[in-house]
A protein has these predicted regions:
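Conserved phosphate-binding/catalytic loops in two-lobed NTP-binding clefts
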Residues: 161-205
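Conserved active-site and cofactor/substrate-binding residues in soluble primary-metabolism enzymes
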Residues: 16-19, 23, 50, 81-85, ...
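Glycine-rich phosphate-binding loop of actin/hexokinase-like ATP-binding domains
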Residues: 1-93
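Adenine-nucleotide phosphate-binding core of ATP-dependent small-molecule kinases
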Residues: 110-114, 121-156
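Oxyanion-binding "anion nests"
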Residues: 91-117, 121-124
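Glycine-rich beta-strand-to-loop/alpha-helix junction loops that act as flexible
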Residues: 46-48, 157-162
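Gly-rich Lys/Arg/Thr-decorated short loops/hinges at beta-loop-alpha junctions or inter-strand turns
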Residues: 2-10, 128-134, 191
Length: 218
């Protein structure tokens, strides 16, 4: 986009989920006994809203969300990355208003829009197991976009999970199953050249800590 939009209106990529990625990076460094300021991570925040963050030497260097939380991964109800030309098609061919487009992309797309069932992965997984093809499509698209984003973020980290095995990441199936329902765990196999960790986030803790630090300075 023209640089003028940044200069005059502050149009830029902001990114979101910063407190979550900050917390997860710090806790993962502790788990692996690594100094966070010398460590590189790719953090994936996966909830109804989803984002991936490339963390180099303990600091964010790239994130999948942009000016708004709409950019990036397929999410619960958000579409993630799309062709910007879609906006012209929706307005000229289907007479959509700007508000209708915003509602479509933010509230009616993603896992909900693809599966036409739910924005909740648990419901979609149950339907996929039962043979629902749209539920399976939604899960496949979600996982594909996530794996592609993780692979892309090896570039800013100057390096490169089952789909990423060629990158040196091998999973321990049992450890992967154990690291569910809020449990932290190292899920990479012993022979994996890179480590993969499941780390539950705690955004509230980071916000509370920041608030406490700010009030100390008042």
């Amino acid at each position: 986009l023209p640089y003028k939009l940044y200069n005059d209106f502050g149009v830029r990529r902001y990114g979101f989920h910063g407190t979550s990625h900050f917390y997860v990076a710090g806790q993962t460094a502790k788990m692996l006994s690594l100094p966070v300021e010398e460590s590189n991570f790719i953090s994936a925040h996966l909830g109804n809203g989803c984002s991936v963050c490339a963390i180099k030497n303990g600091k964010s260097v790239d994130t999948s969300m942009g000016l708004t939380p709409l950019e990036g991964l397929v999410m619960g109800t958000r579409c993630g990355d799309i062709d910007p030309g879609l906006f012209n098609f929706l307005t000229t061919q289907l007479d959509y208003t700007a508000q209708q487009i915003d509602d479509l992309l933010n509230q009616k797309s993603g896992l909900l829009g693809i599966s036409e069932l739910s924005n909740d992965c648990r419901t979609i997984e149950e339907a996929a197991i039962a043979g629902n093809s749209q539920a399976m499509l939604a899960l496949n698209m979600f996982c594909y976009r996530l794996a592609k984003q993780i692979a892309a973020y090896m570039v800013p980290l100057q390096k490169v999970l089952t789909q990423l095995a060629f990158l040196g990441i091998n999973l321990d199936p049992q450890a992967n199953l154990d690291a569910r329902f809020g449990q932290a765990g190292l899920i990479s196999a012993a022979n994996s050249t890179s480590k993969a960790v499941v780390m539950p986030t705690n955004e509230e803790w980071v916000i509370a800590l920041d608030a406490a630090n700010i009030t100390k300075e008042l």
